[in-house]
A protein has these predicted regions:
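Membrane-anchoring hydrophobic segments
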Residues: 1-212, 216-217, 263-270, 284, ...
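Hydrophobic alpha-helical transmembrane segments of integral membrane proteins
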Residues: 76-81, 106-128, 234-260, 357-365
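Short hydrophobic/aromatic segments of transmembrane alpha-helices and their interfaces
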Residues: 229-233, 369-371, 414
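Hydrophobic alpha-helical segments of polytopic membrane proteins
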Residues: 8-17, 124-133, 222-302, 398
């Protein structure tokens, strides 16, 4: 049975663009149908919810015509022909997060927001589509192993435990006077109190919440080691008591759900279908019931608007701002900023290089942080469509490296632990994801734990 499943994996991974209808198997047809269903749900939600309730953020009344609807469908289904069918490698997790939260919502919102949307954004979304398709094809170069059962070594887990406890101690000594479970009314006051007082404190916050705690919680959950799982869970709660980030509080519950899905459906080609169908059904329910049921009103803001709609909207908002006031040409990226000149339009702006704050002030007229995906910040804002292609090249190289060092690991464990990072990839710059949220450390850690010499029976 295992060899049969492995054969299906290899067969699916080596398939390229279809040369005949025989290539389009049942699973691929289901995925295409699910993507189209999700797209129509987003169109319906834009018309019945976003443009009515969330217009402040930039969701305009939709402009329906045959040409933009056809273009939406074409841009949606092209990547679906090459997207992975199985959630069996880290790159699949990141690709689906990007498509679900950024690409498809961006295409729908961008094409509906203006009467001249096609003239405005056709080149931009064509580059986005090309970059995504190229990424889906390129990650297939890493072979998939069927004997993926390795768990994190004891020295690695000990390192994560020590790292977690160190962050606990440093953060407790820094914030012991303001620790609290903030309610809805005082959540922003708590965030102000819990703001990082230095670069080191900031790294302690994000690494505890997005690296050490996910590793420990996933390990404890999958291997049924209760104390390890509790330590990871405590890390999420502790950071929430400092920063009042709802995302951090919800991560362990989302990871628990993801672990169940990866274990039950990871080798099932219908798993991505459930993602798009489930997301589409949720959007339909929100659009129909947000003004009748309080639960759907909350889901409308936190699930639909914040998680799905805004990351997609930011692709076009960043393009509208930076294409007119000047692209950054990656001068906002740490390291490049040391020798690159700040564009004239932002040289006197005290918010530079925080592009999200610049956009919030200049487009929305508010003091906020419009966090966007790496496509918007490191691609669109940097150089428009060509910038998107450039950042996709780097992103694809990183995904290939991550898949390569992930060979042989327990896939359920690894995908569960990586889920928070996949979420961050839809809401943050690529450089921030690598340095501040552990994207680079993951590759180093897996390589170190996998290829170093053995001591005392464990890999070091």
């Amino acid at each position: 049975m295992d060899s049969e499943i492995a054969g299906r994996f290899r067969e699916q991974d080596t398939s390229i663009l279809p040369s005949s209808l025989a290539w389009v198997n049942v699973a691929r047809i289901k995925l295409l149908a699910a993507v189209v269903f999700y797209v129509f749900a987003l169109v319906y939600g834009h018309d019945k919810y976003l443009s009515l309730v969330q217009a402040f953020w930039g969701f305009n009344s939709p402009h329906f015509n045959l040409s933009n609807m056809l273009l939406i469908i074409v841009l949606a289904v092209i990547p679906a022909f090459v997207m992975p069918l199985y959630l069996t490698r880290p790159s699949s997790l990141f690709i689906y997060a990007l498509v679900f939260c950024v690409y498809l919502p961006g295409v729908v919102t961008g094409m509906l927001n203006y009467e001249d949307s096609i003239d405005r954004y056709l080149g931009l979304f064509s580059c986005f589509c090309i970059g995504l398709v190229g990424c889906c094809l390129a990650v297939r170069c890493v072979p998939l192993r069927s004997n993926a059962s390795r768990s994190f070594s004891r020295p690695l887990l000990l390192t994560c435990v020590l790292g977690s406890l160190t962050c606990f101690l440093v953060l407790f000594l820094t914030y012991k006077d303001i620790l609290s479970f903030s309610g809805v009314d005082d959540i922003y006051a708590q965030r102000e109190k819990g703001a990082a007082t230095s670069l080191f404190i900031g790294y302690c916050q994000v690494y505890l919440a997005y690296f050490f705690s996910p590793v420990l919680f996933a390990t404890g959950l999958i291997s049924k080691r209760i104390l390890i799982a509790l330590l990871g869970f405590a890390g999420f709660i502790f950071v929430f008591m400092i920063t009042a980030e709802r995302t951090v509080l919800l991560l362990p519950f989302a990871m628990f759900l993801m672990a169940f899905i990866f274990k039950a459906r990871g080798a099932n080609p219908n798993a991505p279908v459930y993602l798009f169908v489930g997301g589409g059904v949720m959007v339909f329910l929100i659009a129909e019931l947000f003004d009748q049921v309080g639960l759907f009103q909350e889901l409308g803001f936190y699930f639909y608007t914040r998680l799905i709609a805004c990351p997609g909207l930011f692709v076009t908002q960043y393009y509208d701002l930076f294409s007119t006031q000047g692209f950054t040409y990656w001068a906002h990226v740490s390291g490049i900023s040391w020798f690159a000149e700040v564009p004239a339009a932002y040289a006197a702006d005290e918010k530079w290089p925080a592009l999200g704050k610049i956009l919030a002030e200049r487009v929305l007229g508010v003091q906020s942080q419009s966090n966007a995906s790496f496509v918007a910040t490191d691609g669109v804002a940097a150089a428009g469509g060509p910038g998107v292609l450039a950042i996709f090249m780097l992103y694809t190289v990183w995904l290939i490296a991550l898949d390569w060092v992930s060979q042989g690991w327990n896939k359920v464990l690894l995908l569960t632990a990586l889920f928070p990072l996949a979420f961050i990839s839809t809401n943050g710059p690529f450089s921030t994801m690598l340095a501040s949220f552990g994207g680079g450390l993951w590759i180093a850690m897996l390589w170190f734990d996998k290829f170093r010499m053995k001591l005392w029976g464990h890999r070091l």
